[in-house]
Amino acid sequence: MLKMKNITKLFLYLNLCLTLLACSKISPKGEIEVKDVTVENFTKLNLKGDFKVFFAKGNQNLVSVETYPNVYKNLDIEVENGILTIEENRKTDQVDFYNITIFGKNDLNEVSLSDKVEMNVSGQVKTPEFSLHLKGNSKFMGAVIAPKSKIEMAEKSNANILGETKNLNLKLADSASIMAPYFYVENLEILSQNGASAGLNIDQEMKGTLENTSKLIFYGEPLNKLTKKDKASVENRKLK
C-alpha cells in the first residue's frame, strides 16, 4: 500500500514538473541564425505565436526563420491538406529578433493569425476567394484582389488592407479594427459588435448590423441598408 502511495506521489510530481515546463516561457540563447525549411505546396496559412511574418511569391515553397537556435527549435512547421502551420510549442519571452519569411509558389486564399503574429504581404494576393481570420493581438497588412472576400476579426486584432473585392462579408467583435480606406468594396455585408471599428471604401451597397459601440467609417456613396443598435455609429467621409 505504501509503495502504491509513493508511485502516486511520484506520478503527481512528474506531472507537476511537466506542467510547469509547458507553462514556462523560452528566452533567447546563443547567436542569431537563419534556418531554411522546404515545405510542400500550400494555399492557406495558420500562424500562432509572437513573431513577424513576411510573405512573398517565389519559385519554391520555403520557410526561412531568423532568430535564436532555441527559439527556432520551439517552432512546429508543417503542411497538411494545403495548410502551412507555424506554431510555437511554448510562449517566448524577451526575444528581440524573431522574423519568418514565407515564400510560396501559389497565391494564398486563406490566412489565420492568432496570438501576436504580425504579417506583411509583398505584392498582391490574387485569388477568386479570400478569407482572413484574426484574433488575439495579431496584425495583417497587405494588398488583396479577390471577387469574394470574408474577414473575421476578434479581440484586439488589427488589419490594414489595400486592393479590391466585389463582395465582402465582414464580422468584427471585441475591439478589433480594420482601417482600409483604399480597400475598394463593391458590396459590404457586416456584423460588428462590442467596440469594433471599420473604415472601408464602399461603392454599391452596404447592409448588416452594427451593435453596442461599434463604428463604421465609409468612403463613397453606397446604398445604405445598415441597422444600428445601441450606441453604434456610421460616418461618411471623403478621401483627401
Language-model segment annotations:
Residues 1-4, 16:
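Structured catalytic/translocation cores of nucleotide/phosphate-coupled proteins
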Residues 2, 8, 22-74, 83-103, ...:
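Short acidic/polar N-terminal linker immediately downstream of export determinants
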Residues 5-8, 12, 210:
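Intrinsically disordered, low-complexity Ser/Thr/Pro-rich tracts
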Residues 11-21:
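Bacterial N-terminal signal peptides
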Residues 43-55, 101-102, 107-239:
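Extended, compositionally simple hydrophobic/Ser/Thr-rich segments
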